[in-house]
Amino acid sequence: MKSKTYTLGAGDLSVVLRDDGGLLLDAVNDAKTGSAFLSESRPLFSLTAERLADDETFTVSSADGWTVDCTETDGSRLFILSGCEKLPGVTVTLIANLGCGRIGFETVLSSVNEEITLTVCDWPNLCFDAGESAFLFQPYGSGEVWSSVARESFSQTENYPSYGASMQYLAFWDESKKRGVYYGLHDPAPASKLIHVSRAEGENTVTLKISQPLEGISKGCNSQRLYGENVWQIFDGDWFDAAMLYREWAIENASWIPETDENGRKDVPQWFKENPHWWLSRMDHDNVGEETVRATKDLGCKSAAHFYNWHKIPYDNDYPHYFPPKDDMAENVAVMRRAGIRVMPYINGRLWDTKDRGNEDWQFSEKGYPNCTKDRHGKPFIETYNSRESDGKKVELSIMCPSTAVWQETVRDLVDRIFNELKMDAIYIDQIGAAKANPCADKNHPHPAGGGRWWIDSYRNLLTHAHLASDNVMITTECTSDPYMKQIGGYLSWLWIRDGQVPAFNAVYNEYVITFGISYGSITDADSDCMRIFFAQSLVYGVQMGWMRPDLYFRMSHKDFYRKLVKFRETYADYFYGGRMLRPPYLSDNAPRLVSDKCTQAIYGHVDYPAVQGGLWQRMTTGRRLLILVNAAEVPADVDMSVSLPDGTYALNGDMDGSVVLKDGKASLTMPPLSMVYMFAD
């Protein structure tokens, strides 16, 4: 049978689909520049199913022998795929909405097959040709830009929301033409998702896709509509412009946007907004309070303490029984408080130890097991870390189901006691923003089996309930997952220590949530080059600095450089909590790049950045802009910059005097070693 093509046009974007025994993505074109982004056809999507009788999982692509029917309506195309021998009784309906300069895809699944359950479905895959000038954005942590050809192959799939996918969008662009395609999942009350980028070895095609783990996985015939709309849109520019498309949608539509004014979050206490620096303080010795005070005095700036191991139970063991606290906890907290240091203790927000009193099952079988996540056969999902029981075996921690009343009350009661008994300033509830949604299938729980919106909704309900424990509840969590920010005031950005980072998350959300700290403990040997990279990035990205142990601070090199950056963060805090990140300046410099292979959270431990980092911020009350440049090299750097500021003469502040002349948005200057320079634009 002769193949048939369908052209979907929206603004400058033209997408060609081909019916050839299934539905293929045949072309992605830019009408404005005449660019053809894709030269080789690829399947448009894939659908994964599981046989209920034997648990065998298999995946079928849109090219695997489907009958395709297309109906054209006003402003949309309707594609119905049916008759696939590998998936009998399953129909996929794909709706392409054309308008407003973009294509918006919706997906509906229909199954009358009782022998299989549908488990994961892609939205349409966006594919493009790899090349020297072709780059992609993926939302790991702060966001990362990858060259499409830097490695022979790559494949990364991350769970949204989690440490590996802070937002639900991807993008690619041609750097030489500054044109690309935004690929966003506009799901305002979001379901959990999988976010994927790949290029197979020996192939020249890069695939961007987002998938949804499906609902109703405990039985067959689990028909459903995927949540949200998959938006494809041409844009001018690079990662920042793609971020602005996601921001525009999220601010107007997303259910997680908190109330703000010209000073940022309205529900976050002022001390937290203004705090420039964090210590990672563990009660693993008697004088942690005095050590934290001594480090704060040496730093010369306000600090807060993220307080671990305050409980008698071991770390990652006997959860969730954090009370009673250690006998000397109160005195250590009092020592820090007398020095003006705010204290934020740690608890975990998702784990219950299966042996929760030493080597004994105390409450797990009675309370933990009925309320933990389980597969469709009733087997609990279990995680292990480095902690061990008294018999030497690894501690087995069950992942609790956030939909259950028992777990919601357990966390709420802990928050109540920490604020009302211990009188703490904030609470850190670990893993909520970092860990994936588990596809719980316990039929006794109040949610559909598998994926969907229930996991995120349940945690947001849990957090809302926890806020009722006290009038001054301030909650933070691990990592920067966007759908929780309405209930969470601060995100520990600890994994923002990888190669290729760009500040996309804060470009989208800076005034809506506080980001704080990175994992300096992940930098082996306290590598100086690596640490200086992230000193500079933390400042220009708008992150509250630190999250290092006081003993590491005393050992590290270049404390004067670090103190200087923290002091600047303290002095101009209002530009960060009450400001917007504008497009960062484009910079080039002649200093040696800062390279390290000692960052354990980076791919292969490797990071490689220019010596000079920069950021541009705008105060919301006045509109005044603040340009920050940091030379993290130990040598002078000749810097050329292009920045979105009016031409004119600007006074230099910080480690340079005089002025710089900006003409056609460009200027040059020579920065001293280990320096920070800033300028204002009214």
Where are these regions (language model features)?
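Polysaccharide-binding surfaces and accessory modules of carbohydrate-active proteins
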Residues: 3-9, 13, 26-201, 667
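Active-site-proximal substrate-binding groove within the catalytic cores of carbohydrate-active enzymes
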Residues: 28, 211, 220-227, 455-657, ...
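Conserved structural scaffold segments of CAZyme catalytic domains across common CAZy folds
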Residues: 86, 98, 102-104, 113-123, ...
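Short, acidic/polar
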Residues: 284-298, 407-420, 531
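Aromatic- and acidic-residue-enriched carbohydrate-binding clefts of CAZyme catalytic domains
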Residues: 305-326, 358-402, 435-462
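Active-site-adjacent "subsite" loops/lids of carbohydrate-active enzymes
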Residues: 328, 334, 342-422, 498-510
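Active-site neighborhood of glycoside hydrolase catalytic domains
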Residues: 398-488, 500
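C-terminal beta-strand-rich structural cap/linker in extracellular carbohydrate-active enzymes
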Residues: 662-682
